[in-house]
Amino acid sequence: MKTNVIIDGDACPVVNSVIELTKGTGIFVTILRSFSHFSQQIQPEHVKIVYVDDGPDAVDYKIVELASNNDIVITQDYGLASLLIDKVHTVMHHKGNIYHSNNIQSLLDQRYLNAQIRRRGGRHKGPPPFTTEDRLKFEHAFRKIINQI
């Protein structure tokens, strides 16, 4: 069965890593972006970019529609990850963490608590900047996954 990597691509810092690591593997890459992130950059043959409307969650809905059981999905959106855990081969964060049924609920709970703080006018610490170490961790985890398929 054919494997695709589907990337929630509007703000994903590992797009180029995925493209490089999948070259010559027979794995296809689909990058989903909203039209506000349109680019005319030419991609390799194994890469396809799908643009969707700019509406809230439009990219997420399209990913859910396209994803199938042998796919790898890369997203930082915990809500999207929770919808896909039982649908695809692997759902992973761009820092290399794998979403599982045993860790997604605590991530969703933390997201909810942070939203409550923001609604009350409070602030919370955001994620740290993406580093070279994060990229290397992602690439290592991603290589392991594509070598298993």
Swiss-Prot record:
<protein>
    <recommendedName>
        <fullName>UPF0178 protein SE_0451</fullName>
    </recommendedName>
</protein>
<dbReference type="InterPro" id="IPR003791">
    <property type="entry name" value="UPF0178"/>
</dbReference>
<dbReference type="Pfam" id="PF02639">
    <property type="entry name" value="DUF188"/>
</dbReference>
<comment type="similarity">
    <text>Belongs to the UPF0178 family.</text>
</comment>
